[in-house]
Amino acid sequence: MLMKKCKIVLTVLMTCLLLGNTFGSMAVNAAEASDTQAEQTIANTDEYKAFWFSYYDYTAYRAKYKKRNATTFKKYFTHAVKKGKSLGMNCIIVHVRPFGDAMYKSKYFPWSKCISGKQGKNPGYDPLKIMTQVAHANGMKIEAWINPYRVASGSTNYKKLSTKNPARKWHNKKKTRRNVLAYKGSLYYNPAKAQVRNLIVNGVKEIVENYDVDGIHMDDYFYPAFSSSNVNSAFDAKEYRASTMAKGKQNIVRFRREQVNMLVKAIHSAVKSIDPSVTFGISPAGNIDNLTSRYSYYVDINKWLNSSDYVDYICPQIYWGFKHPYAKFDRVTNRWMNAAKSKKVKVYIGIAVYRAGHNIGAGSAERREWRTDANILKKQVQYARKKGCDGFAFFDYQDLKSKKSAKAVKQLKKVLKY
């Protein structure tokens, strides 16, 4: 009887152990699944996951290869695309006009010195053609990125520009000299000139007509910043004083916003008239107060967010951490999502990979956050997804592969690639 009882007890114990292992395993698997789901937060299958390939990356290419030709450039760019793919990215935003120039054979703008070493010098191959081919061959979308108004940064010497540069040509003629303006040591196309708008729009049209791009992208270089002492007298103030808006008693702030609006609307219209499937988006500075300030940018952001006539998407550059003293990532993201409630355009969030692993930020708390928190990029993606954003763009390629940001990028991958 004792033996029988022992066998019964043993059988019960074994059964409990087996059941315990089974349910324990199920519990662990359920917990793991829950953790994975929590990490993902969860993304839509068509979520935009892009990264910027800036003019810095062309400079890095030139530094890496002594022999620079179509073969070495294709090799370099293929590495960039494959890196993005390995992290779960599905779009690359390539700089094609950083300084009133071109990374392709243009009818309007000179070759960029960022690719050939000297403005106006043909590199011997067409970078944009190679980039579109490589991106699509690897299942990745590609957008052509332009800076519309910037001609030269840190120099006002027109002789440093190519003789084929329209800015230099215009400067050489009195009639068109004000199409280009010098301000605080840099050169800009004058936003208030119709000839300038036509040039910029034509430059976009030739890209969409001649290259298999999926989108046109502009970033935050619009008007430069003014002060209370010169806001009414500097830059394009002369054009304002001669305008019907001035005569109609509308102030210079409204005038400047309207110049940018006209350009943006014209680009959107031109792109859609050529190929409705090609997108047009803008990545403005992340602080809405700065965008709507009477002293800088002159971006009519509320109009763009609440109309289908200007852009397909807005991608604010929210380049701050959760510990920023004033512009906390969560607060700024909330403000953008609230501003875009009409759902007329998509909202992507621009994220600063270049800060991860670096001692950078406003105040000791934010600097420590960027320097030590390996989950910072992942948490930003998770937070923005929870708030309903449509995707992300990460700045930039060099930082996605740098040693300093490696830990944060490794964690980022967990919420992008699955």
What is each model feature region?
Residues 19-38:
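Sec-dependent signal peptide cleavage junction
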Residues 67-87, 114-138, 202, 258-265:
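Aromatic- and glycine-enriched glycan-recognition loops and surfaces
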Residues 167-288, 292-307, 317-320:
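Polysaccharide-binding and catalytic clefts of secreted carbohydrate-active enzymes
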Residues 75-102, 210-215, 307-314, 386-391:
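Catalytic domains of carbohydrate-active enzymes, especially glycoside hydrolases
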Residues 306-326, 336, 343-418:
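Substrate-binding cleft of secreted/luminal carbohydrate-active enzymes
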Residues 41-74, 143-144, 149-210:
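Active-site-adjacent "subsite" loops/lids of carbohydrate-active enzymes
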Residues 87-123:
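Aromatic-lined carbohydrate-binding/catalytic grooves of carbohydrate-active enzymes
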Residues 56-71, 108-125, 183-198, 248-260, ...:
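The substrate-binding groove and active-site-proximal loops of carbohydrate-active enzymes
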